[in-house]
Swiss-Prot record:
[2Fe-2S] cluster 1 binds at C58, C63, C66, C88. Its cofactor is [2Fe-2S] cluster; FAD; Mo-molybdopterin. FAD binds at residues 293-300, 373, 383-387, 396, 440, 458. It comes from Oryza sativa subsp. japonica (Rice). This is Xanthine dehydrogenase. [2Fe-2S] cluster 2 binds at C128, C131, C164, C166. Homodimer. Keywords: 2Fe-2S, FAD, Flavoprotein, Iron, Iron-sulfur, Metal-binding, Molybdenum, NAD, Oxidoreductase. It holds the Pfam family Ald_Xan_dh_C. Mo-molybdopterin binds at Q804, F835, R949, A1116.
Length: 1369
C-alpha cells in the first residue's frame, strides 16, 4: 500500500485545496459531519443520531429494509434528483452535500401520516413491520422522482430491491397502486416556497419567517423563483387532511453551496478523498496506487463487511465530470466509467427512441439486461466502471460489452490514454488489464449495423435482484452473399461458466463464414460443449444445468435472429409457430388480488377487518424493535466467536490479538459460565459455549464484548482456535447409513396391517419411491437480537429480546447464571418476524450475552449479522421419505408403508416434536385403511434445525402428495381425481386413533373447483401446450388438513392479565408475542367485544415474564385460540364483578360504570387462564387425540415454465380456506397470502446449500447460502398474477373462541400447489420427447430442477433422462 511522503502531502495541498468540512441535511435539519467517520455507513450514522426507522436487515443491500431517499442538486442540469439507496452500503461521506430523507421525515402520528404511509397501513400492507419503512421510502422516492404519476409496472419495478417475509406482497402492491391512478401533482419540484407562498428555512426545510437567506459563501442571494406550486397528494381513498406537513424541499444551502474537494479520515487509518477533477483522481492514484475508487460502494461495502477486506484509501469519484459523460457520437455511445446504472438506463431509453432501429440492437440488449440487474437501490448508485473493473465472472454486463465490440478507454496518471477491446480486458478471476497507475475512463459502445443482432441472456434462481447462474451476450452480423445469408462476424460470450466472462472461441470460428440456417445447430452445440467445460466440482455446482444453459441460450439466439429476419421479410423459411415460444420472453402484466369473505357480526369488534394495531407505528418507523431500544449507559456490544469446523476437538484458544483490539472489554468462554453450561428446550444436550468438542460450523465457542458493535466483531475475528478435526456426518443418508440418530427419537404409528394388505393380493398395484424435501431458512427480517442488563449488581437480570418465547429466555438465562427464575425478567414488545426461528434458537444468544452482563455488571447488547444468523440458528428440517403404497386399479388407496427421517442437526432442540407432527400429517387428507409410519431423527454435524411454520407437517404432506402423483401416473389419471376419490370424511378414524369431526375438506374442495373453473383451466392448458413447444403451462389442486394444538399436552395452556382503569381504558397483557400475525389485534378485539367498548380503548404494550408467568411459546398457530380465550376469561371475571353495579344504575358509558365500581372497591383486574380440553397422545399405545380440531384448505395454481431455462411464472392462484367465523378476516387473509408465498418459496425457490458430499465445492459443514445475495426468498416479481383468496362461508367452529379457527401455519403447505403445477407443465414437456413415466421432482423446484426434468436433445448431452439434481438434505 502506497503512502504519501511529507513532500507529497505538501505538493497535494499546494496543488489543490482539500476541505475537511462535510455537511449533510437529514429530514430538513442541517448536520455537520465530523472528521473521523469514514468507516461508518449512512445507516450507522442515522441510527446513532436517533433515527431508528431505517433498519438493518442484511447489511449487503439485499433486503431493502434500510432504504432512504437521497436528494442532490445537479449543477449541470440545474435540477434536483431524488433516488432511493441502501443506507447499509452507502459510506457516510458519500452523501455529503445531499439531503437524506428517512421514514421519520415524511410523516408520523403526531404530525400526520404521509399519504403513502397511510395507504400502506390502511391496506393491511404491514404485518411484522420491520421491512415496512423500506417499502415506504422506495415508493416515496419513486413519487418524488416522477414528473407524472408512475405506471403500475414502474411501481412494481421500484420495489424489486425490497423484501417482505410476511405479507406475500399483494397488499403492498394494492396499497401503492392508487398512486398510479390519479393525476395529482407528485412532489417533484424543488421550490423554495411552500404552497401558501411562505419562505422555506434553509436549515429546517420547513416554512418559516426568518426573512432573506444567505448562501454558504456569505453573499446575498435572492430566493429562486418557484416553478410549481405543490401540496401533499390527496386521493379519494386517503384521508389527506390528516397529513398537515408539506414535503421537505431540497435545502437552498445545498443548492447554492460551492462543492469542494474532500479529504476526511476514519477509524484505523482510513482516508476518504472526494476529488472534483480528473487530475485530482490521477494524482491520488499516483500517490496511492492501490486505492479503491468507489461510486456506490455496492461491491467494496460487501467485501469489507463480509470478507474482512481492508482498504486504507478510498477515492470517491462521484463528482468528477470527466467520468460522468454520456454522449452520442458517430462511432457510438460514450459512457463515462462513473455513470450510474440507473442513469444509463434512462439514457438508453432516450437513445432508442431517437436513433434508427438498426443502430440500437446493442442498446436494447443492455437496457433489457439492466432491468434484471440487482434492485432499484443498487442501480441508483452502482456505476458502469465499478461493475466492469470488479470483473465478476457472473457480471450481467461484461459479456455484453465483449459481445457488442465495446472498447474501454483507459487513462494513466500521466494523462496517457489507451484503448482496449472489452474482449481483451478481462485477464482472470477478478483481474483486469488495468495497471495500478491507471483507471477506466469510459466505455465506447458502437452502433450496430443493418442485419447485426445483439441479444442478452440471464438465468438466476430468482428473476429480480439476483445474481446470474449463467448469463450471456451474443451478437451476429450476417450479409447476403449470392442469395444466401452468410455469417460475417459473431461473438458468443458467457458468464457464470469460468473464472472470467468466457468467449466461445471455437464456436465463433466455426460459425464465421457459414450459412445461417438450421443446419448450423448440431455442430454448434457440439462445439459449445467443447468451448464451455465445467469441472465436476466447479464452484457454484449445478454443472449439468449450467452447461445445458449455454446451448439453450444459443438456441434461443438462433431462433431470435431467424424470427427477426423473417418478420423483416428477409428470410423465407420462417419459424414454426410452436417454436416461437422459445424466443418469447414472458412479459409480466400487473398482478391482481381478490379477497372474498363475509361479515357475519355487526356492532362488535370481533369479526371486523380492522387494521393491525401497530400499523401506524410501523409505516412511520416509530414501532420499536429490540435493536431500536435506547441502550442504558455503559452498554457493551457483543459478537460471537464461532466454530469453523463441522466436528473437531478444540486444542487451544488464543485471544491475545483480540485482547489488544480497540475497545475490547472481555472474552467469555465455557469456564466463565456461573451456572450450567448445558441447556436446551427439551433435553439439555447443547452447550452455551463449546468446551471441548465442536459438533457443527457456527457453534458458539465464545463471546467477545467491546465498546462498539464493530469493535466487538473485529475482536471476535481475532480469536484464534486450533482444532483437531474429527469425522463428520453431513446428510440424512450418511446418518442413516452410519446409524447416527438422536437418542430415544424412534417413533412408529400403525393402523390396520400393512404387511397383510400387501401380501393379500387386494392391491392391484404397488409402487415404491423416495422423496427428498429440502430445508428452508426462516429469513425473518429482524435478525436475532437481545439486550441484557443486571439490576442491583446482578441480583436480578432483565432483558429485552426478539423472541417468540420470553419464558424460554427466562429459563435459559436463569439456568446459565444459576439464578432462580423469579429474578430473571424477559420482555418482548414486538418482533420483526419469527416463523418458529425465534421459539428456541434465540434463547441461547440471550444466555450467552447474559454471562457477560452478569460477570461485568454491565448491560450487553447482541445483534447478529444476517450471515451469522443464518449459519448458526438452524432452519426448517430437511426430510427424507421412503414410501410403499398399495392401491386398486380404481385408484383406491389400501396401504401406506412410510419411513421418514428428518435432519435434526447436532442437538435435539425440537426435532422430535417436529418428527412427531410430520408423522401425524403423513396422511394429509386421505383415508387409508392400513398405515405404518416409522420415523427417526438423524444426528448430523449441522446447526440444530428447529421449528418453522408447519413444524414438520408440510414436509410430510409433500411426501404424501408425491406418492399420490405417483399413483396417478401409474393409473394414467389426473392426480385431482385420485385425491378426491380418497378424501377423509366425517367420522374417519385417523392412523393415530383420532376421530375426525367437523370435516370440511369436501366443501372446501368443491368450492375451489368452481372458483378456479378447473375443467376449463385444464382445457386451456392443453390447448396452450399443443401450440407451444418450448413454453409449457401446468395446473394443480392441492388440499391440506392441519392439526391445531401443541402435540405436547402441557403446552396447551395460556394466561392473561386484564386491568381496567377508571377512565374506561383497558390494559391487556398476555403470554403471546406479536410477530406480525396480528395476535395483539385479535386479542384486543376479543377484549373490546367482551366489554362492548371501542377497540381504541384497549391497549397491549408488551409481553413480559413478570406479568404473565410460565407462558407457552407463541407457536403452533394456537396463540389466538389460547390467549384469546384466556383474555376472555379475565374479561368475564371482571364483568361478573361489575354486573351488580351495572344493574343498579343507568351508566352513560363504560367509563362511568368503571368509576362507579372503583368507588365501591370492586377489583378491576383479573388473571385469565385457559387450557385446551380433550387433547393428549400416548406414544406407547400409539393412540390419542393430539389435535383439538383441524383447519382445512385447498389451493389451485397455474404456472408457465420456460423448458429451455427452467424459469417459471405463477399465473394464477386460487385459495379456499375454512377458518370458521373469523375474528379478523383481513388479518386472516393476510396470513393466508403470506403463508402461501412463503410456502411457494419453500417449494420452488429457496434452496439451502451446505458443504456436503453433493456440494464438495463448499467447505465441509459450511452454509453457502447465508444471505440474500445467495439465498432467494420470493420477491414482488414472484407473486401470482391473479391471486384470489376466499374464506369458506357458513361454517362455525364451536370448539374455539367466537367459532374461529387458527390460520398461521395451515396455508403454508398450499404453496406446494405451485410445485405440482410446475410438475404438470414438465410432464407436458417430457411428453413431447416421448417420456410419459413417473419422474421425481424434489423440492425446491428451482430452475435447475425444472430445466433438467424437461428432457430434450440439449439436456441429454449432459445428463440422463432420469437425472436428479443434487440437494442438501
Amino acid at each position: 500500500m502506497g503512502s504519501l511522503t511529507r513532500a507529497e502531502e505538501e505538493e497535494t495541498a499546494a496543488a489543490e485545496e482539500w476541505s475537511g468540512e462535510a455537511v449533510v441535511y437529514v429530514n430538513g435539519v442541517r448536520r455537520v459531519l465530523p472528521d473521523g467517520l469514514a468507516h461508518l455507513t449512512l445507516l450507522q450514522y442515522l441510527r446513532d443520531i436517533g433515527l431508528p426507522g431505517t433498519k438493518l436487515g442484511c447489511g449487503e443491500g439485499g433486503c431493502g429494509a434500510c432504504t432512504v431517499m437521497v436528494s442532490c442538486y445537479d449543477q449541470t442540469t440545474k435540477k434536483t434528483q431524488h433516488f432511493a439507496i441502501n443506507a447499509c452500503l452507502a459510506p457516510l461521506y458519500s452523501v455529503e452535500g445531499m439531503h437524506i430523507i428517512t421514514v421519520e421525515g415524511i410523516g408520523n402520528r403526531q404530525r400526520g401520516l404521509h399519504p403513502i404511509q397511510e395507504r400502506l397501513a390502511m391496506a393491511h400492507g404491514s404485518q411484522c413491520g420491520f421491512c415496512t419503512p423500506g417499502f415506504v421510502m422506495s415508493m416515496y422516492a419513486l413519487l418524488r422522482s416522477s414528473e407524472q404519476p408512475p405506471t403500475e409496472e414502474q411501481i412494481e419495478d421500484s420495489l424489486a430491491g425490497n423484501l417482505c417475509r410476511c405479507t406475500g406482497y399483494r397488499p403492498i402492491i394494492d396499497a401503492f397502486r392508487v398512486f398510479s391512478k390519479r393525476d395529482d401533482l407528485l412532489y417533484n419540484n424543488s421550490s423554495l416556497k411552500n404552497a401558501d407562498g411562505r419562505p422555506i428555512c434553509p436549515s429546517t426545510g420547513k416554512p418559516c419567517s426568518c426573512g432573506d437567506q444567505k448562501d454558504i459563501n456569505g453573499s446575498e442571494s435572492s430566493l429562486l423563483t418557484p416553478t410549481k406550486s405543490y401540496s401533499p397528494c390527496s386521493y379519494n381513498e386517503i384521508d389527506g387532511n390528516a397529513y398537515s406537513e408539506k414535503e421537505l424541499i431540497f435545502p437552498p444551502e445545498l443548492q447554492l453551496r460551492k462543492v469542494t474537494s474532500l479529504k476526511l479520515n476514519g477509524f484505523n487509518g482510513i482516508r476518504w478523498y472526494r476529488p472534483l477533477k480528473l487530475k485530482q483522481v490521477l494524482h491520488l492514484k499516483a500517490c496511492y496506487p492501490n486505492a479503491k475508487l468507489i461510486i456506490g460502494n455496492s461491491e467494496v461495502g460487501v467485501e469489507t463487511k463480509f470478507k474482512n477486506a481492508q482498504y486504507k484509501v478510498l477515492i470517491s469519484v462521484t463528482h468528477v465530470p470527466e467520468l460522468h459523460t454520456l454522449k452520442v457520437k458517430e462511432d457510438g455511445i460514450h459512457i463515462g466509467s462513473s455513470v450510474r446504472l440507473a442513469q444509463l438506463q434512462n439514457f438508453l431509453r432516450k437513445v432508442i427512441l431517437e436513433r434508427d432501429s438498426h443502430e440500437i440492437s446493442s442498446c436494447e440488449a443492455i437496457l433489457r439486461q439492466l432491468k434484471w440487474f440487482a434492485g432499484t437501490q443498487i442501480r441508483n448508485v452502482a456505476s458502469v466502471g465499478g461493475n466492469i473493473c470488479t470483473a465478476s465472472p457472473i457480471s450481467d454486463l461484461n459479456p455484453l460489452w465483449m459481445a457488442t465490440g465495446a472498447t474501454f478507454e483507459i487513462i494513466d496518471v500521466n494523462n496517457n490514454i489507451r484503448t482496449i477491446p472489452a474482449k481483451d480486458f478481462f485477464l482472470g478471476y477478478r483481474k483486469v488489464d488495468l495497471k495500478p497507475d491507471e483507471i477506466l475512463l469510459s466505455v465506447i459502445l458502437p452502433w450496430t449495423r443493418p442485419f447485426e443482432f445483439v441479444k442478452e441472456f440471464k438465468q438466476a434462481h430468482r428473476r429480480e435482484d439476483d445474481i446470474a447462474l449463467v448469463n450471456a451476450g451474443m451478437r451476429v452480423y450476417i450479409r447476403k452473399v449470392e442469395g444466401d445469408w452468410i455469417i460475417s462476424d459473431v461473438s458468443i460470450i458467457y458468464g457464470g461458466v469460468a473464472a472470467v466472462s468466457h468467449r466461445a472461441s471455437k464456436t465463433e470460428t466455426f460459425l464465421t463464414g457459414k450459412k445461417w440456417d438450421y443446419g448450423l445447430l448440431d455442430k454448434t452445440f457440439d462445439l459449445l460443449k467443447e468451448d464451455v467445460v465445467l469441472a465436476e466440482n466447479a464452484p457454484g455446482g449445478m454443472v449439468e444445468f449450467r452447461s445445458s444453459l449455454t446451448l439453450s441460450f444459443f438456441f434461443k439466439f438462433f431462433l431470435h435472429v431467424t424470427h427477426e429476419m423473417n418478420i423483416k421479410g428477409f428470410w423465407k423459411d420462417g419459424l414454426h409457430a410452436t417454436n416461437l415460444s422459445a424466443i418469447q420472453s414472458f412479459t409480466r402484466p400487473v398482478g391482481v388480488g381478490t379477497q372474498c369473505y363475509e361479515l357475519v357480526r355487526q356492532g362488535t369488534a370481533v369479526g371486523q377487518p380492522v387494521v393491525h394495531t401497530s400499523a401506524m407505528l410501523q409505516v412511520t418507523g416509530e414501532a420499536e424493535y429490540t435493536d431500536d431500544t435506547p441502550t442504558p449507559p455503559n452498554t457493551l456490544h457483543a459478537a460471537l466467536v464461532l466454530s469453523t469446523k463441522a466436528h473437531a476437538r478444540i486444542l487451544s484458544i488464543d485471544a491475545s490479538l483480540a485482547k489488544s483490539s480497540p475497545g475490547f472489554a472481555g472474552l467469555f468462554l465455557s469456564k466463565d459460565v456461573p451456572g450450567a453450561n448445558h441447556t436446551g428446550p427439551v433435553i439439555h444436550d447443547e452447550e452455551v459455549f463449546a468446551s471441548d468438542v465442536v459438533t457443527c460450523v457456527g457453534q458458539i465457542v465464545g463471546l467477545v464484548v467491546a465498546d462498539t458493535r464493530d469493535n466487538a466483531k473485529a475482536a471476535a475475528n481475532k480469536v484464534n482456535i486450533e482444532y483437531s478435526e474429527l469425522p463428520a456426518i453431513l446428510s440424512i443418508e450418511e446418518a442413516v447409513k452410519a446409524g447416527s440418530f438422536h437418542p430415544n427419537s424412534k417413533r412408529c404409528l400403525v393402523k390396520g396391517n400393512v404387511e397383510q394388505c400387501f401380501l393379500s393380493g387386494a392391491c392391484d398395484r404397488i409402487i415404491e419411491g423416495k422423496v427428498q424435501v429440502g430445508g428452508q431458512e426462516h429469513f425473518y427480517m429482524e435478525p436475532q437480537s437481545t439486550l441484557v442488563w443486571p439490576v442491583d449488581s446482578g441480583n436480578e437480570i432483565h432483558m429485552i429480546s426478539s423472541t417468540q418465547a420470553p419464558q424460554k429466555h427466562q429459563k435459559y438465562v436463569a439456568n446459565v447464571l444459576g439464578l432462580p427464575q423469579s429474578r430473571v425478567v424477559c420482555k418482548t414488545k414486538r418482533i420483526g418476524g419469527g416463523f418458529g426461528g425465534k421459539e428456541t434458537r434465540s434463547a441461547i444468544f440471550a444466555a450467552a450475552a447474559s454471562v457477560a452482563a452478569y460477570c461485568l455488571r454491565q448491560p450487553v447488547k447482541l445483534v447478529l449479522d444476517r450471515d451469522i444468523d443464518m449459519m448458526t440458528t438452524g432452519q426448517r428440517h430437511s426430510f427424507l421419505g421412503k414410501y410403499k403404497v398399495g392401491f386398486t386399479d380404481d385408484g383406491k388407496i389400501l396401504a401406506l408403508d412410510l419411513d421418514v427421517y428428518n435432519n435434526g442437526g447436532h442437538s435435539h432442540d425440537l426435532s422430535l416434536p417436529v418428527l412427531e407432527r410430520a408423522m401425524f400429517h403423513s396422511d394429509n387428507v386421505y383415508d387409508i385403511p392400513n398405515v405404518r409410519v416409522n420415523g427417526q431423527v438423524c444426528f448430523t454435524n449441522f446447526p440444530s434445525n428447529t421449528a418453522f411454520r408447519g413444524f414438520g407437517g408440510p414436509q410430510a404432506m409433500l411426501i404424501a402428495e408425491n406418492w399420490i402423483q405417483h399413483m396417478a401416473t401409474e393409473l394414467k389419471r389426473s392426480p385431482e381425481e385420485i385425491k378426491e376419490l380418497n378424501f377423509q370424511s366425517e367420522g374417519s378414524v385417523l392412523h393415530y386413533g383420532q376421530l375426525l369431526q367437523n370435516c370440511t375438506i369436501h366443501s372446501v374442495w368443491d368450492e375451489l373447483k368452481v372458483s378456479c373453473n378447473f375443467m376449463e383451466a385444464r382445457k386451456a392448458v392443453i390447448d396452450f401446450n399443443n401450440n407451444n413447444r418450448w413454453r409449457k403451462r401446468g395446473i394443480a389442486m392441492v388440499p391440506t388438513k392441519f392439526g391445531i394444538s401443541f402435540t405436547t399436552k402441557f403446552m396447551n395452556q395460556a394466561g392473561a392479565l386484564v386491568q381496567v382503569y377508571t377512565d374506561g381504558t383497558v390494559l391487556v397483557t398476555h403470554g403471546g408475542v406479536e410477530m406480525g400475525q396480528g395476535l395483539h389485534t385479535k386479542v384486543a378485539q376479543v377484549a373490546a367485544s367482551s366489554f362492548n367498548i371501542p377497540l381504541s380503548s384497549i391497549f397491549i404494550s408488551e409481553t413480559s415474564t413478570d406479568k404473565v408467568p410460565n407462558a407457552t411459546p407463541t407457536a403452533a398457530s394456537a396463540s389466538s385460540d389460547l390467549y384469546g380465550a384466556a383474555v376472555l376469561d379475565a374479561c368475564q371475571q371482571i364483568m361478573a364483578r361489575m354486573e351488580p353495579v351495572a344493574s343498579r344504575g343507568n351508566h352513560k358509558s363504560f367509563a362511568e360504570l368503571v368509576l362507579a365500581c372503583y368507588l365501591e372497591r370492586i377489583d378491576l383486574s383479573a388473571h385469565g387462564f385457559y387450557i385446551t380440553p380433550d387433547v393428549g397422545f400416548d406414544w406407547v399405545s400409539g393412540k390419542g387425540t393430539p389435535f383439538y380440531y383441524f383447519t382445512y384448505g385447498a389451493a389451485f395454481a397455474e404456472v408457465e415454465i420456460d423448458t429451455l431455462t427452467g424459469d417459471f411464472h405463477t399465473r394464477t392462484v386460487d385459495i379456499v380456506m375454512d377458518l370458521g367465523c373469523s375474528i379478523n378476516p383481513a388479518i386472516d387473509i393476510g396470513q393466508i397470502e403470506g403463508g402461501f408465498i412463503q410456502g411457494l418459496g419453500w417449494a420452488a425457490l429457496e434452496e439451502l446449500k451446505w458443504g456436503d458430499d453433493n456440494h464438495k465445492w463448499i467447505r465441509p459443514g459450511h452454509l453457502f447460502t447465508c444471505g440474500p445475495g445467495s439465498y432467494k426468498i420470493p420477491s414482488v416479481n414472484d407473486i401470482p398474477l391473479n391471486f384470489k383468496v376466499s374464506l369458506l362461508k357458513g361454517v362455525l367452529n364451536p370448539k374455539v373462541i367466537h367459532s374461529s379457527k387458527a390460520v398461521g401455519e395451515p396455508p403454508f403447505f398450499l404453496g406446494s400447489a405451485v410445485l405440482f403445477a410446475i410438475k404438470d407443465a414438465i410432464s407436458a414437456a417430457r411428453a413431447e420427447e416421448g417420456h410419459f413415466d413417473w419422474f421425481p421432482l424434489d423440492s425446491p423446484a428451482t430452475p435447475e430442477r425444472i430445466r433438467m426434468a424437461c428432457v430434450d436433445s440439449i439436456t441429454k448431452k449432459f445428463a440422463s433422462v432420469y437425472y436428479r439434481p443434487k440437494l442438501s438434505v
